[in-house]
Amino acid sequence: MIKDFFILDFSYEIKGNTPLVYIWSVDDEGNSSVVIDNNFRPYFYIIYEGNENEIIENIKKNCEALQITKVKRKYLGNIVDALLIQTSTPTQIKKCREKISELNNIKGIFDADIRYTMRYSLDFDLRPFTWFRAEVNEVKFDGFRTKKAYILDKILSHYEGNMPELRTIGVDFQIYSKYGSLNPRKDPIVVMSLWSKEGPMQFSLDEGIDDLKIIRRFVDYILNYDPDIIFVYDSDLLPWKYITERASSLGVKIDIGRKIGSEVSVGTYGHYSISGRLNVDLTGLLVNERSLGHVDLIDVSNYLGISPSRYSFKWYEISRYWDNEKNRRIIREYSIENARSIYLLGNYLLSTYSELVKIVGLPLDKLSVASWGNRIETSLIRTATKSGELIPIRMDNPNRPSKIKKNIIIQPKVGIYTDVYVLDISSVYSLVIRKFNIAPDTLVKEQCDDCYSSPISNYKFKREPSGLYKTFLDELSNVRDSNKIKVIEELISSFNDYVHWVNARWYSREIASAFDEFSNEIIRFIIDLIKSSGLDVILANDLLIFVTGGSRDKVNELITKINSLYNLDVKVKIFYKSLLVLDNNRYAGLSEGDKIDIARKGEEDMNLCELARNIKRKIIEEILISKDVKKAIKLVKSTVIKLRRGEFDNEELITWAKIERDLNEYNNQLPFVTAARKAIQSGYLISKDSKIGYVIVKGLGPLNDRAEPFFLVKEKNRIDIEYYVDQIFRETLKLLKPLGVNEESLKKTNITDILDLFGASKKK
């Protein structure tokens, strides 16, 4: 029979030394389906020199190859002889690759680290969230939970079409833990909430059951509802890791996939994979969302206009509320409202990211954890495969920076500004690649009379034919669907970072340098044009130019001129009513909708206590709204006075750290490592992927020796207040010093400051 299928995901398993490809999909009648292909074998390529027959014989001696075939392929744009080596299973590729690399006359190994299901997707040009038509035979399989199962005979065609109605669900859960590190062996799940098209569903300990029954009810609900996509949201708690480990400690398996017996497991990209379903952590999508400076669920929901939960809790506060039976209702409501927000947010993002899935070709759950660099590289691999270009093996080097630091185009003008237009100049990078045909397969290292040459280093690039990068960008530019415009712009704007990513498959120092030389020349021309028109450039980075001093009409007129001169697509990305500039990559703006964007906030705040984080944000808000630095100074001084008077909660002074490897691999001088060791000595479970919260207590020893797990410090008088005072002064001075505030004036407290504090207290 001939059927059409909408693709969700791919997976495979080995049966009798034969790999079976599973195409998880929805058929044209709306049935959850699996299409099984048992005829596809893994392979990779080598290029060589010397006697071909001898090389083939040596390969056969060292590698269990099913078949070795001589083929023509491209290597950096040049036609070369290559050997296609086919193996029985994907795992054999790695063994063959290692042995072949030791043989003589092997010039290169290619395509050997392409995942098996990706290889399948590439060869048949099948992409998730698109359709394919195929000749299939319906079969009965006991091992699947899909409504239909088919054996593939032949793929006839593939095409884009309307997305069928997918069954989606949002999941939230809350854990009871009295201490500073979640322990799945002892800390129960007290509430598990789900939200779908059919409305809410919740299981809780308050119903007189234990969390073993909560987990079982959750599993039953997922199996009965049979969602295509499960949305979760939590970058801190690692939801599936906790659920699976908690279930394991209780003797339960989380078998909720569409392949019976396949438990939730860690996938290739580090995400948690559920066979036949897309398990999407929305945090992963939003971390890569350039327009958002934070990924807190409530903040994001507000930012995107989705009604968030009425409550806000830190995870370590749940136990305190749960211990009071009158407050349990609040926790239940908090969780169900979170599940609703997750469900709504997931469906909101689905409409945008489904288009990116089609372009890149990664399933949504994998896409959610893939960086923009990986997204671009996956797209380039597809483009290269179509042209017969060999795919280099990625050579990760942990001893060098992942990106080359780029030069600052102009020095930023530090200060507070009003009526700032932010120009998106990301189209410069696609222009440079298209205009000068920059690519790894067009780079010429010998004499070339008919090449483009970079302005400074004189690196040369063939004019014809179109290189890999230009071909890829031309494919994107041919898309006219308005729903895809945003994600295409994101891909293009990320190309600048990709070119400088030293662990990329096609990274080249020459390309990165030439790319900078060409693009900087154009950007400087744009800046000069802006200045000559009477406007002021206060900040410029790789993607944006911040302009002030003119009306919207004047800015639009200037943009039209720039675009016509260089065939660009420069546009106003955002208008800030006020903008605080601290340096080239540190700024904050207040938009017309009174939303505050803060650049580089997350990186700087990693090792700060909650109080310091909060005061920094309040200072930024004060400066942007009132534009009064004196008010910001008063805010710092009043915070310090309250701190010294003991007007704080211990929780405000907690610094959180995630333990990303075994403790014995860390430098013992780190405060959070000391705190973690002390927690273990006191009988608490602390392990890799745990979060540890610590405070600094009084004492004469070094700082790390005075770090204590926060749950072991109950008395305020044990805490080293002056350590936190210094932290607040140090961090707030980073914001205020560029605005003319010196350390002495910030730290000096006079009678007026104290009276102001008491006056504020009385007003309250």
Curated annotation (Swiss-Prot):
PANTHER family reported for this sequence: DNA POLYMERASE CATALYTIC SUBUNIT, DNA POLYMERASE DELTA CATALYTIC SUBUNIT
Record protein name field: DNA polymerase 3
GO BP terms: DNA-templated DNA replication
Top-level taxon: Archaea
Catalyses which reaction(s): DNA(n) + a 2'-deoxyribonucleoside 5'-triphosphate = DNA(n+1) + diphosphate
InterPro entries the record matches: DNA-dir_DNA_pol_B, DNA-dir_DNA_pol_B_exonuc, DNA-dir_DNA_pol_B_multi_dom, DNA/RNA_pol_sf, DNA_pol_B_thumb, DNA_pol_palm_dom_sf, DNA_pol_type-B, RNaseH-like_sf
Entries under SUPFAM superfamilies matching the protein: DNA/RNA polymerases, Ribonuclease H-like
